[in-house]
Amino acid sequence: MKMNVVVLSVVVLLLFIANIQQTEAGKPEKEVNFPAPGKKPTREDCKKACANKYTNGVMSKVIVAKLTGKNCYCKYQEN
């Protein structure tokens, strides 16, 4: 009887974790272009600016950051 309770608890826990991961993975991605910050911006400057403007400073949600001339291209996952 105790073994059944343990197995059931583990299964419920795994389903809960899988649901959290699926929810995070299912968030939509957005693409934006905006003026590059500073006089001599780098790709890293674009990534930081994108994170600050669109993801509340969460760098890990920035999927792609590119410097194109004097503009930044950014693809990020919504909060």
Swiss-Prot record:
Compartments annotated for it: namely: Secreted
Regarding tissue, the record states: Expressed by the venom gland.
- Could you confirm whether the keyword Secreted appears in this record? yes
In terms of superkingdom, the source organism counts as Eukaryota
Q: Name one GO molecular function term.
A: toxin activity
Q: Where is the signal peptide?
A: 1-25
- Coiled coil ranges (UniProt) are none
Modification(s) after translation: Contains 2 disulfide bonds.
State the GO CC annotations: extracellular region
Record-stated family:
Belongs to the scoloptoxin-15 family.
Q: What are the protein's UniProt keywords?
A: Disulfide bond, Secreted, Signal, Toxin
Recorded protein name is U-scoloptoxin(15)-Sm1a
